[in-house]
């Protein structure tokens, strides 16, 4: 048995502009090559675009988008009796938030547009309105577990 100390999970501090933990998670997900200032500028510009387009508080729209994109169930590979099955597993709250952030950023990068802030703003607005590629990804994840619901009994060790 390992004698190493278990490292504590570290969370980023709340964002200074919006005082939100979710916004700081978004900034760290957008971050590339340590350029945090650029990532903050992208997120702030995206939130300004959201404010102009929707006439709502961008933080409320962003939180609604995260809630809409968060999956409830995902499938994991589980080896049972010599064969591998895709077993449906419930997703914890933190993992669901991380997955939704990852999907929003992934599909905003794939969008056609001039700047990342415009693409990110459009993806957040679409996700908040229950349309777009992020919602399709969530529904696809839920559909993957539909034909194999009977395998939920093998989830004991997860």
UniProtKB/Swiss-Prot annotation:
| MF-aspect GO terms | rRNA binding; structural constituent of ribosome
Q: Which domain of life is it from?
A: Eukaryota
Q: Name one process (GO BP) from the record.
A: translation
Per UniProt, subcellular location reads as: Plastid, Chloroplast
Q: Which UniProt keywords apply?
A: Chloroplast, Plastid, Ribonucleoprotein, Ribosomal protein, RNA-binding, rRNA-binding
User: Is Calcium set as a keyword in this record?
Assistant: no
GO cellular component terms listed in the entry, alphabetical order: chloroplast; small ribosomal subunit
Q: Does the keyword Plastid apply?
A: yes
Functional note: One of the primary rRNA binding proteins, it binds directly to 16S rRNA where it nucleates assembly of the head domain of the 30S subunit.
Question: Which family does this protein fall into?
Answer: Belongs to the universal ribosomal protein uS7 family.
Instruction: Indicate the quaternary assembly.
Output: Part of the 30S ribosomal subunit.
Q: What is this protein called?
A: Small ribosomal subunit protein uS7c
The gene name reads rps7
């Amino acid at each position: 048995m390992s004698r190493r100390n278990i490292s504590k999970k570290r969370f980023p501090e709340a964002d200074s502009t919006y005082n939100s933990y979710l916004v700081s998670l978004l900034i760290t997900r957008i971050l590339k090559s340590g350029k945090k200032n650029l990532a903050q500028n992208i997120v702030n510009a995206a939130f300004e675009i959201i404010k102009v387009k929707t006439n709502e508080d961008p933080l409320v729209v962003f939180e609604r988008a995260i809630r809409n994109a968060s999956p409830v169930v995902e499938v994991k590979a589980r080896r049972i009796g010599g064969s591998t099955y895709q077993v449906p597993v419930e997703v914890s709250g933190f993992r669901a938030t991380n997955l939704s952030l990852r999907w929003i950023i992934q599909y905003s990068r794939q969008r056609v547009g001039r700047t990342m802030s415009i693409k990110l703003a459009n993806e957040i607005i679409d996700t908040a309105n229950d349309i777009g590629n992020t919602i399709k990804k969530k529904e696809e994840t839920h559909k993957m577990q539909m034909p194999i619901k009977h395998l939920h009994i093998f989830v004991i060790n997860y």
